Protein backbone atom coordinates (compact mmCIF):
# COMPACT_ATOMS: atom_id res chain seq x y z
CA UNK A 1 0.00 0.00 0.00
CA UNK A 2 1.52 3.28 -1.15
CA UNK A 3 0.91 6.36 1.05
CA UNK A 4 1.77 9.54 -0.92
CA UNK A 5 3.82 11.97 1.14
CA UNK A 6 1.53 14.92 0.31
CA UNK A 7 -1.58 13.06 1.48
CA UNK A 8 0.23 11.88 4.61
CA UNK A 9 1.29 15.46 5.36
CA UNK A 10 -2.18 16.89 4.78
CA UNK A 11 -3.93 14.13 6.74
CA UNK A 12 -1.60 14.44 9.71
CA UNK A 13 -1.90 18.22 9.71
CA UNK A 14 -5.68 18.05 9.52
CA UNK A 15 -5.74 15.57 12.41
CA UNK A 16 -3.54 17.86 14.50
CA UNK A 17 -5.73 20.91 13.84
CA UNK A 18 -8.91 18.90 14.56
CA UNK A 19 -7.49 17.67 17.87
CA UNK A 20 -6.68 21.22 18.93
CA UNK A 21 -10.00 22.75 17.87
CA UNK A 22 -12.21 19.91 19.10
CA UNK A 23 -10.34 19.21 22.33
CA UNK A 24 -9.92 22.79 23.52
CA UNK A 25 -12.74 24.69 21.78
CA UNK A 26 -15.66 22.60 20.53
CA UNK A 27 -15.93 20.01 23.31
CA UNK A 28 -15.82 22.55 26.19
CA UNK A 29 -18.54 24.61 24.47
CA UNK A 30 -20.70 21.51 23.99
CA UNK A 31 -20.19 20.51 27.62
CA UNK A 32 -21.00 24.00 28.91
CA UNK A 33 -24.12 24.10 26.75
CA UNK A 34 -25.33 20.75 28.10
CA UNK A 35 -24.68 21.86 31.70
CA UNK A 36 -26.47 25.18 31.15
CA UNK A 37 -29.57 23.32 29.96
CA UNK A 38 -29.57 20.93 32.91
CA UNK A 39 -28.61 23.28 35.76
CA UNK A 40 -31.72 25.48 36.06
CA UNK A 41 -34.51 25.98 38.58
CA UNK A 42 -37.16 25.04 36.06
CA UNK A 43 -40.03 23.08 37.67
CA UNK A 44 -39.53 19.33 37.34
CA UNK A 45 -35.74 19.47 36.97
CA UNK A 46 -33.45 17.50 39.28
CA UNK A 47 -31.67 20.67 40.35
CA UNK A 48 -35.00 22.28 41.32
CA UNK A 49 -35.86 19.30 43.53
CA UNK A 50 -32.48 19.28 45.29
CA UNK A 51 -32.58 23.06 45.69
CA UNK A 52 -36.08 23.27 47.15
CA UNK A 53 -35.72 20.32 49.55
CA UNK A 54 -32.14 19.57 50.51
CA UNK A 55 -32.09 15.76 50.97
CA UNK A 56 -29.39 15.83 53.65
CA UNK A 57 -28.76 18.01 56.72
CA UNK A 58 -26.03 20.57 57.07
CA UNK A 59 -23.96 20.48 60.23
CA UNK A 60 -24.48 23.42 62.56
CA UNK A 61 -22.04 23.97 65.43
CA UNK A 62 -22.48 26.46 68.28
CA UNK A 63 -19.54 27.55 70.45
CA UNK A 64 -20.33 29.68 73.52
CA UNK A 65 -17.97 31.98 75.44
CA UNK A 66 -18.51 31.36 79.13
CA UNK A 67 -17.50 34.39 81.25
CA UNK A 68 -15.56 32.96 84.20
CA UNK A 69 -15.23 36.24 86.17
CA UNK A 70 -18.64 37.95 85.79
CA UNK A 71 -18.56 39.87 89.10
CA UNK A 72 -15.12 41.30 88.34
CA UNK A 73 -16.18 42.35 84.83
CA UNK A 74 -19.21 44.10 86.34
CA UNK A 75 -16.71 46.25 88.24
CA UNK A 76 -14.66 47.04 85.14
CA UNK A 77 -12.16 44.15 85.01
CA UNK A 78 -10.89 42.41 81.87
CA UNK A 79 -13.19 39.51 80.88
CA UNK A 80 -11.84 35.96 81.04
CA UNK A 81 -13.53 33.70 78.52
CA UNK A 82 -13.84 29.93 78.29
CA UNK A 83 -15.00 28.49 74.97
CA UNK A 84 -17.60 25.74 75.42
CA UNK A 85 -18.61 23.63 72.43
CA UNK A 86 -19.39 22.51 69.93
CA UNK A 87 -23.07 21.91 70.55
CA UNK A 88 -23.94 20.06 67.34
CA UNK A 89 -27.22 20.34 65.45
CA UNK A 90 -28.51 18.89 62.19
CA UNK A 91 -29.77 21.78 60.08
CA UNK A 92 -32.42 20.98 57.50
CA UNK A 93 -33.17 23.55 54.81
CA UNK A 94 -36.32 23.67 52.73
CA UNK A 95 -38.24 26.20 50.66
CA UNK A 96 -42.03 26.40 50.56
CA UNK A 97 -44.78 28.47 48.91
CA UNK A 98 -42.89 28.44 45.61
CA UNK A 99 -44.30 30.75 42.91
CA UNK A 100 -42.86 30.85 39.39
CA UNK A 101 -42.92 33.87 37.09
CA UNK A 102 -42.24 32.55 33.60
CA UNK A 103 -42.08 36.00 32.01
CA UNK A 104 -39.49 37.35 34.49
CA UNK A 105 -37.85 33.91 34.75
CA UNK A 106 -37.94 34.06 38.57
CA UNK A 107 -39.19 31.93 41.43
CA UNK A 108 -40.31 33.26 44.83
CA UNK A 109 -40.13 31.17 47.99
CA UNK A 110 -39.97 31.30 51.76
CA UNK A 111 -36.83 29.92 53.38
CA UNK A 112 -37.11 27.69 56.43
CA UNK A 113 -34.32 26.33 58.63
CA UNK A 114 -34.91 23.53 61.12
CA UNK A 115 -32.37 22.72 63.84
CA UNK A 116 -32.38 19.31 65.54
CA UNK A 117 -29.99 18.67 68.41
CA UNK A 118 -27.55 15.83 67.73
CA UNK A 119 -26.66 14.37 71.16
CA UNK A 120 -24.25 11.78 69.76
CA UNK A 121 -22.10 14.30 67.90
CA UNK A 122 -22.26 16.76 70.82
CA UNK A 123 -20.80 14.37 73.40
CA UNK A 124 -19.61 14.92 76.06
CA UNK A 125 -21.86 17.99 76.04
CA UNK A 126 -25.59 17.49 76.63
CA UNK A 127 -27.01 20.99 76.21
CA UNK A 128 -27.85 21.20 79.91
CA UNK A 129 -24.54 22.84 80.82
CA UNK A 130 -24.84 26.17 82.64
CA UNK A 131 -23.31 29.10 80.80
CA UNK A 132 -22.61 32.64 82.01
CA UNK A 133 -23.27 35.28 79.36
CA UNK A 134 -24.11 39.00 79.31
CA UNK A 135 -27.78 39.36 80.21
CA UNK A 136 -29.38 39.04 76.74
CA UNK A 137 -32.18 41.54 77.47
CA UNK A 138 -30.88 43.91 80.12
CA UNK A 139 -27.51 44.77 78.55
CA UNK A 140 -28.58 45.23 74.91
CA UNK A 141 -31.74 47.05 76.03
CA UNK A 142 -29.97 49.39 78.44
CA UNK A 143 -27.18 50.25 75.97
CA UNK A 144 -29.69 50.92 73.15
CA UNK A 145 -31.77 53.24 75.33
CA UNK A 146 -28.67 55.16 76.44
CA UNK A 147 -27.58 55.67 72.81
CA UNK A 148 -30.93 56.40 71.21
CA UNK A 149 -33.52 57.34 73.87
CA UNK A 150 -31.61 58.64 76.86
CA UNK A 151 -34.66 60.58 78.11
CA UNK A 152 -36.41 57.28 78.84
CA UNK A 153 -33.56 55.83 80.90
CA UNK A 154 -35.21 56.27 84.31
CA UNK A 155 -38.43 54.61 83.16
CA UNK A 156 -36.59 51.71 81.53
CA UNK A 157 -34.35 51.19 84.55
CA UNK A 158 -37.34 50.91 86.86
CA UNK A 159 -39.14 48.57 84.47
CA UNK A 160 -36.11 46.25 84.23
CA UNK A 161 -35.89 46.00 88.02
CA UNK A 162 -39.53 44.83 88.12
CA UNK A 163 -39.53 42.42 85.17
CA UNK A 164 -36.11 41.00 86.13
CA UNK A 165 -35.88 41.37 89.93
CA UNK A 166 -32.39 41.05 91.44
CA UNK A 167 -30.89 40.64 87.97
CA UNK A 168 -27.16 41.10 87.43
CA UNK A 169 -25.25 42.20 84.37
CA UNK A 170 -24.40 38.57 83.61
CA UNK A 171 -26.94 35.75 83.47
CA UNK A 172 -26.29 32.13 84.39
CA UNK A 173 -28.54 29.71 82.49
CA UNK A 174 -28.55 26.36 80.70
CA UNK A 175 -27.38 26.35 77.10
CA UNK A 176 -30.66 25.00 75.68
CA UNK A 177 -32.65 27.61 77.64
CA UNK A 178 -30.52 30.45 76.31
CA UNK A 179 -30.57 29.30 72.70
CA UNK A 180 -33.81 27.37 72.10
CA UNK A 181 -36.18 26.74 75.02
CA UNK A 182 -36.09 30.32 76.28
CA UNK A 183 -35.67 32.23 79.55
CA UNK A 184 -38.76 33.56 81.31
CA UNK A 185 -39.91 37.17 80.86
CA UNK A 186 -42.64 38.08 83.39
CA UNK A 187 -44.88 40.89 82.17
CA UNK A 188 -47.63 40.37 84.77
CA UNK A 189 -46.86 43.51 86.79
CA UNK A 190 -49.37 46.35 86.72
CA UNK A 191 -46.66 48.96 87.26
CA UNK A 192 -46.56 51.53 84.45
CA UNK A 193 -42.81 51.21 83.94
CA UNK A 194 -43.07 47.41 83.62
CA UNK A 195 -45.97 47.69 81.17
CA UNK A 196 -44.06 50.26 79.13
CA UNK A 197 -41.04 47.95 78.97
CA UNK A 198 -43.17 44.95 78.00
CA UNK A 199 -44.75 46.87 75.13
CA UNK A 200 -41.82 45.94 72.88
CA UNK A 201 -42.58 42.26 73.56
CA UNK A 202 -46.30 42.54 72.85
CA UNK A 203 -45.73 44.46 69.59
CA UNK A 204 -43.24 41.88 68.31
CA UNK A 205 -40.26 44.23 68.23
CA UNK A 206 -38.25 41.65 70.17
CA UNK A 207 -38.14 38.99 67.45
CA UNK A 208 -36.37 36.47 69.69
CA UNK A 209 -39.30 36.35 72.14
CA UNK A 210 -42.23 33.93 71.99
CA UNK A 211 -45.47 34.69 73.80
CA UNK A 212 -46.56 31.83 76.07
CA UNK A 213 -49.71 33.38 77.57
CA UNK A 214 -51.19 36.79 78.32
CA UNK A 215 -48.40 37.80 80.70
CA UNK A 216 -45.33 35.66 79.96
CA UNK A 217 -42.79 35.38 77.16
CA UNK A 218 -39.83 33.10 76.48
CA UNK A 219 -36.69 34.73 75.09
CA UNK A 220 -33.97 32.73 73.27
CA UNK A 221 -31.30 33.47 70.70
CA UNK A 222 -32.52 30.94 68.11
CA UNK A 223 -35.79 29.42 69.31
CA UNK A 224 -37.98 31.68 67.21
CA UNK A 225 -35.86 31.06 64.11
CA UNK A 226 -36.21 27.28 64.42
CA UNK A 227 -38.62 25.77 61.86
CA UNK A 228 -40.08 29.15 61.03
CA UNK A 229 -40.14 31.72 58.25
CA UNK A 230 -36.67 33.19 57.75
CA UNK A 231 -37.43 35.46 54.81
CA UNK A 232 -39.17 35.63 51.45
CA UNK A 233 -36.79 35.49 48.48
CA UNK A 234 -37.25 36.04 44.75
CA UNK A 235 -34.41 34.64 42.63
CA UNK A 236 -33.66 34.03 38.95
CA UNK A 237 -34.39 30.53 37.64
CA UNK A 238 -31.60 30.61 35.04
CA UNK A 239 -33.77 29.24 32.21
CA UNK A 240 -33.39 32.26 29.91
CA UNK A 241 -29.97 33.32 31.16
CA UNK A 242 -28.00 30.63 32.96
CA UNK A 243 -25.46 33.16 34.25
CA UNK A 244 -28.18 34.66 36.48
CA UNK A 245 -29.10 31.35 38.12
CA UNK A 246 -30.00 31.90 41.79
CA UNK A 247 -29.41 35.67 41.68
CA UNK A 248 -31.46 37.42 44.38
CA UNK A 249 -33.90 39.86 42.79
CA UNK A 250 -36.02 40.63 45.86
CA UNK A 251 -36.02 39.98 49.59
CA UNK A 252 -39.14 40.54 51.69
CA UNK A 253 -40.79 41.57 48.40
CA UNK A 254 -38.45 44.55 48.09
CA UNK A 255 -35.93 45.06 45.22
CA UNK A 256 -33.42 46.55 47.66
CA UNK A 257 -32.96 47.13 51.37
CA UNK A 258 -33.61 50.36 53.24
CA UNK A 259 -31.21 49.84 56.14
CA UNK A 260 -27.84 51.40 55.36
CA UNK A 261 -27.12 55.10 54.73
CA UNK A 262 -25.90 54.55 51.16
CA UNK A 263 -27.92 52.85 48.44
CA UNK A 264 -25.06 50.67 47.16
CA UNK A 265 -24.82 48.77 50.45
CA UNK A 266 -28.57 48.14 50.23
CA UNK A 267 -28.26 46.27 46.91
CA UNK A 268 -28.62 42.51 46.64
CA UNK A 269 -25.51 40.92 45.16
CA UNK A 270 -25.22 37.20 44.48
CA UNK A 271 -27.48 34.26 45.29
CA UNK A 272 -29.28 32.97 48.39
CA UNK A 273 -26.13 30.82 49.06
CA UNK A 274 -27.90 27.53 48.26
CA UNK A 275 -27.24 27.56 44.49
CA UNK A 276 -24.65 29.09 42.16
CA UNK A 277 -24.48 29.52 38.40
CA UNK A 278 -22.25 27.11 36.43
CA UNK A 279 -19.32 28.29 34.35
CA UNK A 280 -18.17 31.03 36.72
CA UNK A 281 -14.66 32.44 36.42
CA UNK A 282 -12.47 32.15 39.49
CA UNK A 283 -11.88 35.92 39.60
CA UNK A 284 -15.66 36.55 39.74
CA UNK A 285 -15.83 35.35 43.34
CA UNK A 286 -18.81 33.71 45.03
CA UNK A 287 -21.38 36.25 46.21
CA UNK A 288 -24.41 35.61 48.41
CA UNK A 289 -26.91 37.71 50.33
CA UNK A 290 -26.96 37.01 54.08
CA UNK A 291 -30.19 38.16 55.81
CA UNK A 292 -28.64 37.77 59.28
CA UNK A 293 -26.21 40.56 58.39
CA UNK A 294 -28.49 42.50 56.02
CA UNK A 295 -25.55 42.40 53.63
CA UNK A 296 -24.11 40.59 50.62
CA UNK A 297 -20.73 38.96 51.13
CA UNK A 298 -18.25 37.84 48.47
CA UNK A 299 -15.80 34.97 48.78
CA UNK A 300 -12.59 35.37 46.81
CA UNK A 301 -10.32 32.75 45.20
CA UNK A 302 -7.49 31.54 47.44
CA UNK A 303 -5.84 28.50 45.83
CA UNK A 304 -6.49 25.23 44.00
CA UNK A 305 -7.82 22.30 46.02
CA UNK A 306 -9.34 18.85 45.54
CA UNK A 307 -12.22 16.87 47.00
CA UNK A 308 -12.57 13.09 46.69
CA UNK A 309 -9.98 13.17 43.91
CA UNK A 310 -11.76 15.89 41.91
CA UNK A 311 -10.12 19.27 41.28
CA UNK A 312 -11.79 22.31 42.84
CA UNK A 313 -11.11 25.92 43.81
CA UNK A 314 -10.72 27.06 47.43
CA UNK A 315 -12.52 30.32 48.24
CA UNK A 316 -12.51 32.28 51.48
CA UNK A 317 -13.98 35.52 52.83
CA UNK A 318 -13.81 37.96 55.71
CA UNK A 319 -15.64 41.11 56.78
CA UNK A 320 -12.81 43.35 55.60
CA UNK A 321 -11.75 46.72 56.95
CA UNK A 322 -14.76 49.02 56.62
CA UNK A 323 -12.81 52.10 57.64
CA UNK A 324 -10.02 51.52 55.07
CA UNK A 325 -12.19 50.40 52.13
CA UNK A 326 -14.07 53.30 50.57
CA UNK A 327 -16.60 50.93 49.01
CA UNK A 328 -17.60 49.78 52.51
CA UNK A 329 -18.03 53.22 54.09
CA UNK A 330 -21.79 52.88 53.67
CA UNK A 331 -21.69 50.35 56.54
CA UNK A 332 -20.50 53.10 58.90
CA UNK A 333 -23.09 54.93 61.00
CA UNK A 334 -22.08 58.09 59.15
CA UNK A 335 -20.22 57.46 55.86
CA UNK A 336 -18.76 60.98 56.07
CA UNK A 337 -17.31 60.39 59.55
CA UNK A 338 -14.85 57.48 59.59
CA UNK A 339 -14.78 57.55 63.39
CA UNK A 340 -18.22 55.94 63.28
CA UNK A 341 -16.86 52.93 61.37
CA UNK A 342 -16.42 49.66 63.28
CA UNK A 343 -12.93 48.22 63.93
CA UNK A 344 -11.18 46.10 61.30
CA UNK A 345 -12.73 42.65 60.95
CA UNK A 346 -16.09 43.62 62.49
CA UNK A 347 -19.47 44.86 61.34
CA UNK A 348 -22.00 46.89 63.32
CA UNK A 349 -25.38 45.11 63.23
CA UNK A 350 -27.34 47.77 65.12
CA UNK A 351 -29.13 48.96 61.98
CA UNK A 352 -29.88 45.38 60.97
CA UNK A 353 -31.05 43.76 64.23
CA UNK A 354 -31.93 46.80 66.33
CA UNK A 355 -29.41 46.19 69.11
CA UNK A 356 -25.74 46.81 69.99
CA UNK A 357 -24.44 43.67 68.32
CA UNK A 358 -21.28 43.27 66.26
CA UNK A 359 -20.41 40.52 63.79
CA UNK A 360 -16.89 39.18 63.25
CA UNK A 361 -14.94 36.10 62.35
CA UNK A 362 -14.58 33.62 65.27
CA UNK A 363 -12.03 34.73 67.89
CA UNK A 364 -11.71 38.00 65.90
CA UNK A 365 -9.70 36.18 63.23
CA UNK A 366 -8.24 38.73 60.76
CA UNK A 367 -9.56 41.52 63.00
CA UNK A 368 -7.95 44.40 64.85
CA UNK A 369 -5.40 42.93 67.34
CA UNK A 370 -6.82 45.18 70.07
CA UNK A 371 -10.06 43.18 69.98
CA UNK A 372 -8.17 40.04 70.98
CA UNK A 373 -6.10 41.88 73.59
CA UNK A 374 -9.19 43.31 75.34
CA UNK A 375 -10.24 39.86 76.61
CA UNK A 376 -8.50 36.69 77.77
CA UNK A 377 -9.13 33.27 76.24
CA UNK A 378 -9.05 33.88 72.47
CA UNK A 379 -6.77 32.10 70.01
CA UNK A 380 -7.58 33.10 66.41
CA UNK A 381 -6.24 30.80 63.68
CA UNK A 382 -7.03 29.99 60.06
CA UNK A 383 -7.72 26.27 60.50
CA UNK A 384 -10.49 26.66 63.07
CA UNK A 385 -11.88 30.11 62.33
CA UNK A 386 -11.59 30.94 58.61
CA UNK A 387 -14.47 30.65 56.17
CA UNK A 388 -13.81 28.34 53.22
CA UNK A 389 -15.61 26.88 50.20
CA UNK A 390 -14.25 24.16 47.89
CA UNK A 391 -16.06 24.94 44.65
CA UNK A 392 -16.22 23.32 41.20
CA UNK A 393 -16.59 26.14 38.68
CA UNK A 394 -17.86 24.38 35.56
CA UNK A 395 -20.88 22.74 37.24
CA UNK A 396 -21.33 25.36 39.96
CA UNK A 397 -21.09 22.75 42.71
CA UNK A 398 -19.84 23.50 46.25
CA UNK A 399 -18.15 20.25 47.36
CA UNK A 400 -17.60 21.34 50.94
CA UNK A 401 -17.95 24.57 52.87
CA UNK A 402 -17.77 26.05 56.35
CA UNK A 403 -19.47 29.40 56.99
CA UNK A 404 -18.36 30.77 60.35
CA UNK A 405 -19.58 33.88 62.13
CA UNK A 406 -19.23 35.30 65.64
CA UNK A 407 -21.73 37.52 67.45
CA UNK A 408 -20.44 40.06 69.96
CA UNK A 409 -21.91 42.61 72.33
CA UNK A 410 -20.77 46.21 71.84
CA UNK A 411 -20.57 46.73 75.59
CA UNK A 412 -20.31 49.94 77.58
CA UNK A 413 -21.28 51.22 81.01
CA UNK A 414 -24.79 52.59 81.60
CA UNK A 415 -25.01 55.03 84.50
CA UNK A 416 -28.77 54.84 84.80
CA UNK A 417 -28.90 51.07 85.42
CA UNK A 418 -27.23 49.96 88.64
CA UNK A 419 -25.83 46.55 87.53
CA UNK A 420 -24.33 48.14 84.40
CA UNK A 421 -22.75 51.35 85.66
CA UNK A 422 -19.19 50.00 85.96
CA UNK A 423 -18.98 47.79 82.87
CA UNK A 424 -15.83 48.22 80.72
CA UNK A 425 -16.15 49.53 77.18
CA UNK A 426 -15.17 46.77 74.75
CA UNK A 427 -16.51 44.34 72.18
CA UNK A 428 -17.35 41.18 74.14
CA UNK A 429 -17.62 37.83 72.27
CA UNK A 430 -20.78 35.89 73.16
CA UNK A 431 -20.89 32.91 70.77
CA UNK A 432 -19.95 31.81 67.29
CA UNK A 433 -21.54 29.39 64.85
CA UNK A 434 -20.39 27.21 61.98
CA UNK A 435 -22.72 26.13 59.20
CA UNK A 436 -21.13 23.58 56.92
CA UNK A 437 -21.61 20.83 54.40
CA UNK A 438 -19.51 18.01 52.94
CA UNK A 439 -21.05 16.25 49.97
CA UNK A 440 -20.90 12.46 50.19
CA UNK A 441 -20.02 10.20 47.27
CA UNK A 442 -23.67 9.78 46.28
CA UNK A 443 -23.72 13.39 45.11
CA UNK A 444 -20.08 13.88 44.15
CA UNK A 445 -20.33 10.84 41.86
CA UNK A 446 -23.02 12.68 39.89
CA UNK A 447 -20.43 15.31 39.07
CA UNK A 448 -17.61 12.81 38.71
CA UNK A 449 -19.31 10.55 36.15
CA UNK A 450 -21.19 13.21 34.21
CA UNK A 451 -18.57 15.95 34.11
CA UNK A 452 -15.11 14.66 34.94
CA UNK A 453 -15.51 11.36 33.06
CA UNK A 454 -16.37 13.34 29.92
CA UNK A 455 -13.40 15.62 30.50
CA UNK A 456 -11.10 12.61 30.93
CA UNK A 457 -12.36 10.94 27.74
CA UNK A 458 -11.88 14.22 25.87
CA UNK A 459 -8.35 14.52 27.26
CA UNK A 460 -7.40 10.99 26.19
CA UNK A 461 -8.94 11.47 22.75
CA UNK A 462 -7.30 14.80 21.98
CA UNK A 463 -3.83 13.75 23.14
CA UNK A 464 -4.10 10.46 21.20
CA UNK A 465 -5.00 12.35 18.04
CA UNK A 466 -2.16 14.81 18.61
CA UNK A 467 0.30 11.92 19.10
CA UNK A 468 -0.79 10.14 15.91
CA UNK A 469 -0.72 13.38 13.93
CA UNK A 470 2.80 14.20 15.12
CA UNK A 471 3.99 10.72 14.11
CA UNK A 472 2.45 11.25 10.67
CA UNK A 473 4.11 14.64 10.34
CA UNK A 474 7.50 13.15 11.20
CA UNK A 475 7.10 10.45 8.52
CA UNK A 476 6.09 13.15 6.04
CA UNK A 477 9.20 15.15 6.88
CA UNK A 478 11.31 12.01 6.42
CA UNK A 479 9.86 11.40 2.95
CA UNK A 480 10.38 15.00 1.86
CA UNK A 481 13.94 14.91 3.16
CA UNK A 482 14.77 11.78 1.14
CA UNK A 483 12.79 13.05 -1.88
CA UNK A 484 10.63 9.95 -1.88
CA UNK A 485 7.21 10.33 -3.44
CA UNK A 486 5.46 7.92 -1.09
CA UNK A 487 5.77 5.71 1.90
CA UNK A 488 5.56 2.02 0.77
CA UNK A 489 4.11 0.38 3.83
CA UNK A 490 3.89 -3.09 2.18
CA UNK A 491 7.57 -2.92 1.16
CA UNK A 492 8.61 -1.98 4.68
CA UNK A 493 6.61 -4.85 6.13
CA UNK A 494 8.02 -7.27 3.47
CA UNK A 495 11.63 -6.26 4.21
CA UNK A 496 11.07 -6.70 7.89
CA UNK A 497 9.66 -10.18 7.27
CA UNK A 498 12.70 -11.11 5.11
CA UNK A 499 15.08 -10.11 7.85
CA UNK A 500 13.16 -12.23 10.31
CA UNK A 501 13.16 -15.24 7.88
CA UNK A 502 16.90 -15.01 7.22
CA UNK A 503 17.66 -14.80 10.91
CA UNK A 504 15.62 -17.92 11.62
CA UNK A 505 16.88 -20.14 8.66
CA UNK A 506 20.68 -19.55 8.61
CA UNK A 507 22.76 -22.75 9.15
CA UNK A 508 26.10 -22.98 11.04
CA UNK A 509 29.24 -22.07 8.99
CA UNK A 510 31.23 -25.09 7.57
CA UNK A 511 34.89 -25.47 8.56
CA UNK A 512 37.58 -23.71 6.48
CA UNK A 513 39.37 -25.59 3.63
CA UNK A 514 42.73 -26.79 5.00
CA UNK A 515 44.38 -26.90 1.56
CA UNK A 516 45.85 -23.59 0.63
CA UNK A 517 48.18 -22.70 -2.30
CA UNK A 518 50.17 -20.53 -0.01
CA UNK A 519 52.42 -21.30 2.86
CA UNK A 520 50.74 -18.53 4.73
CA UNK A 521 48.19 -20.07 7.08
CA UNK A 522 44.83 -18.32 7.17
CA UNK A 523 43.38 -17.20 10.47
CA UNK A 524 40.97 -19.76 11.94
CA UNK A 525 37.39 -18.41 11.81
CA UNK A 526 34.89 -19.13 14.56
CA UNK A 527 31.74 -21.08 13.84
CA UNK A 528 29.47 -18.11 14.44
CA UNK A 529 27.50 -16.52 11.65
CA UNK A 530 29.00 -13.12 10.91
CA UNK A 531 27.79 -11.41 7.73
CA UNK A 532 30.48 -11.42 5.02
CA UNK A 533 32.70 -14.10 6.66
CA UNK A 534 30.98 -17.26 5.52
CA UNK A 535 33.56 -19.28 3.51
CA UNK A 536 30.91 -20.44 1.12
CA UNK A 537 30.02 -16.93 0.15
CA UNK A 538 33.12 -14.86 0.85
CA UNK A 539 35.18 -14.46 -2.42
CA UNK A 540 38.36 -13.87 -0.45
CA UNK A 541 38.58 -17.56 0.45
CA UNK A 542 39.02 -18.54 -3.29
CA UNK A 543 42.01 -16.30 -3.98
CA UNK A 544 45.45 -17.94 -4.35
CA UNK A 545 48.36 -16.44 -2.49
CA UNK A 546 51.42 -15.91 -4.75
CA UNK A 547 54.91 -16.38 -3.28
CA UNK A 548 57.39 -13.64 -4.17
CA UNK A 549 61.10 -13.76 -3.50
CA UNK A 550 62.77 -10.94 -1.68
CA UNK A 551 65.48 -8.89 -3.35
Curated annotation (Swiss-Prot):
Entry keyword Disulfide bond: yes
Topology versus the membrane: Multi-pass membrane protein
GO molecular function: scavenger receptor activity
Record key words, sorted: Cell membrane, Disulfide bond, Glycoprotein, Membrane, Olfaction, Receptor, Sensory transduction, Transmembrane, Transmembrane helix
Intervals, Extracellular compartment: 29-459
Subcellular compartments: Cell membrane
Protein name as catalogued: Sensory neuron membrane protein 1
Annotated gene: Snmp1
Amino acid sequence: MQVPRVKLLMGSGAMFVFAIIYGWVIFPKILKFMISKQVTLKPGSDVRELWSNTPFPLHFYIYVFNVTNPDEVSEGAKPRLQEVGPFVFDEWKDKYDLEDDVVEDTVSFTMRNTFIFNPKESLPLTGEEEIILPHPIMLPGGISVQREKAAMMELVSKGLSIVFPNAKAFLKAKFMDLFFRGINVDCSSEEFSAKALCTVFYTGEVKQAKQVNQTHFLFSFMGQANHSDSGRFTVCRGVKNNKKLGKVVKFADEPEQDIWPDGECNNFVGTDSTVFAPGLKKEDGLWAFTPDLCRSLGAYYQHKSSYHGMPSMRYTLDLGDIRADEKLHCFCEDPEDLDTCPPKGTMNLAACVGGPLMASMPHFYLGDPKLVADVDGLNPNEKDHAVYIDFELMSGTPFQAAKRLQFNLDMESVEGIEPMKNLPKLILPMFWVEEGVQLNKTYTNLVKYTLFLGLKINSVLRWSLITFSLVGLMFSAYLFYHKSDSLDINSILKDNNKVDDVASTKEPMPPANPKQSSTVHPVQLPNTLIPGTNPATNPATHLKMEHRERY
